[in-house]
Amino acid sequence: MVEFSHTKKIGSAGRFGSRYGRKIRVRLRDVEIKQNKDYKCPVCAFPKLKRAGTSIWVCEKCGAKIAGGAYTPETGAGKVVTKAIRRVIESKSREI
């Protein structure tokens, strides 16, 4: 019998077979897809920002190291804070 490292529906989480339950394997699949996706470097805009470790992202072109989220370079909360800061800066520049 040949063991497959992935399945059609679950993807790479198929390596666990029927263990741990479907819901957990689907969550794992979603995290692994986000984690291994190529992201754009905020320094040079090259689309090869790779995860080096937990919350550490490195650009393959310019070598910039960025601290971000565990599975994505920018978390949802980080995006909200960035937008809020940008709004404050824009409102202050309008006042001057």
From Swiss-Prot:
A Pfam short name: Ribosomal_L37ae
Keywords: Metal-binding, Ribonucleoprotein, Ribosomal protein, RNA-binding, rRNA-binding, Zinc, Zinc-finger
UniProt-annotated binding residues for Zn(2+): C41, C44, C59, C62
Cofactor(s) the protein needs: Zn(2+)
SUPFAM superfamilies for the chain: Zn-binding ribosomal proteins
InterPro entries: Ribosomal_eL37/eL43, Ribosomal_eL43, Ribosomal_protein_eL43, Ribosomal_zn-bd
Note on how the cofactor is bound: Binds 1 zinc ion per subunit.
Oligomer status and interactors: Part of the 50S ribosomal subunit.
Protein name from the UniProt record: Large ribosomal subunit protein eL43
